[in-house]
């Protein structure tokens, strides 16, 4: 039988999934991307503001990177996270990079030092 906490997380995820395709609110052992905003800059690049949630416990287990991934699975860019964010959850960091005009959507995924990949990802349109 599922406990109340798990049922609550399932209900929370279901409600959020129905309301928005650009956010997620599940926090687990893996690092979850919970929000992504992409804006075109004046020089034609894209600033990607990404919010990550992870239960960082210190240097032994923390969210250490997030990636911007093309539809073919290739990594367009990565934002390295140089330290744990134990007291700042969720946290937002930015990356500015060029995205080819033929790429209309990207997936943003987070990585942690123990589980690597596997948390919630977000697919977002590129505003060319």
Where are these regions (language model features)?
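Short, solvent-exposed, Trp/other aromatic-anchored flexible loops in extracytoplasmic proteins
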Residues: 78-116
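Ser/Thr-rich low-complexity repeats and stalk/linker segments
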Residues: 70-78
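Edge beta-strands of extracellular beta-sandwich domains
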Residues: 117-126
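Short, surface-exposed binding/anchoring microloops in extracellular/periplasmic proteins
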Residues: 29-63
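Bacterial N-terminal signal peptides that target proteins for export
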Residues: 2-14
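N-terminal signal peptide c-region/cleavage motif recognized by signal peptidases
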Residues: 20-25
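Hydrophobic residues positioned within well-ordered beta-strands of beta-sheet architectures
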Residues: 34, 48, 64, 93-95, ...
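Beta-strand signatures of extracellular beta-sandwich domains
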Residues: 65-69
């Amino acid at each position: 039988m599922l406990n109340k906490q798990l049922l609550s997380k399932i209900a929370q995820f279901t409600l959020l999934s129905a309301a928005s395709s650009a956010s997620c609110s599940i926090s687990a052992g893996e690092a979850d991307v919970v929000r992504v905003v992409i804006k075109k800059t004046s020089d034609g690049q894209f600033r990607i503001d990404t919010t990550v949630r992870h239960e960082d416990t210190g240097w032994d287990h923390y969210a250490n990177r997030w990636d911007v991934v093309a539809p073919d699975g290739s990594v367009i860019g990565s934002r390295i996270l140089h330290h744990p964010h134990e007291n700042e959850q969720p946290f937002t960091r930015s990356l500015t990079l060029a995205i080819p005009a033929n790429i209309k959507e990207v997936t943003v995924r987070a990585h942690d030092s123990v589980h690597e990949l596997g948390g919630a990802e977000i697919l977002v349109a590129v505003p060319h």
